[in-house]
C-alpha cells in the first residue's frame, strides 16, 4: 500500500504552476505503474481540480498540458474537474472529452445556447432548456448532465437527486 505524507507532500496549490502540475502528473504515473507492476487489484485514482482557470492566461499558454490531461489522464487513473465562469472559455477539445457537466445558473443567454447546442443530440433544445430552468430554479441548484449515460433517460438530472424527463 502506498501512503502519502500530507505534511511533506504538497497537494493543494493556490496558483496554477505548470511545473508543479507536471510533477503531480509524473508522480501519479509512477504510482500507477508501481501498482500495475505489483498487480494491485485497486489502483489509486487522483483528481486534479482546476478552479476558475479558463480565463487564466497561464492556462492558455499551457493548453497542451491541459489537453493531455483530458485526453490521456484516464489511462493513468487521473480525473480532471474544471470550473469556469464561462462555458465557452473552455476549449472545445476539452469540452468534447468531458464525461459530465454541472451547469449552474448562467449569466448569459449565449452561454446557455452554447450548452444547449452541444448536448441536444438526444432531446431538442427547447426540452433541454426546460430541464435547465427547472434544475436551476432554486438557489445553488444545478443541472447535472451525464454525457456518458447509456440511456437518454439517465442523462439529465436536477442536482444528483431528480431525473429530468420530457
Model-derived segments and spans:
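P-loop NTPase motor core of the ASCE superfamily
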Residues: 39, 62, 111-166
